[in-house]
Amino acid sequence: MSVLKDNIDVSSLTTVKINPNEKQNKVEKGDLFFMTSSETKEEVALCSTLSYDVKNLYLNSFCFGYRVNNLNLINNEYLNCLLHSPKYRKQISNLGQGFTRVNISKNKLLELLVEVPDMKQQIRIVSINNKINYKINSEINKLNKLNELKKGLMQNMFV
């Protein structure tokens, strides 16, 4: 499961065998996941939200999860959006330690103070962010199709 994007792509999930004596942390819709280790400070603790109900889904050892306990106070998608903002990415990347691999302490990350506007404003921010991300993804898809078209044309031009 990749947590490098805003939302987890459930189609990319794989299965593993879990022994009965292994303790596993079950994840739920709305949970946030953070990378604990990265090659760069800029990617350490990037987070992603699970937007779907998935049965028997457990946390892996490469990331840690966070569950918002009071959804009346903070919207999990807003928190994800906030933690991707340049202001918070800078604070989070400064918490990363290491040279070859940059690691982050879960406890240090959980000490981070975040701005929490009223719920109406949080939902507005999430809506705007989702619309922008949709537009970006649409443009990326168009660019990819144009690049494929160009590649095909170039191959046919110089046969």
Question: What residue ranges belong to the model's regions?
Answer:
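Sequence-specific dsDNA recognition surfaces
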Residues: 1-33
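Short, surface-exposed secondary-structure edge patches
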Residues: 21-26, 40, 54-55
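Short, Lys/Arg- and Gly-enriched loop/turn segments at beta-strand edges
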Residues: 41-48
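A short glycine-rich beta-alpha junction/loop motif
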Residues: 56-64, 74, 96-120
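Amphipathic alpha-helical coiled-coil/heptad-repeat segments
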Residues: 108-111, 115-159
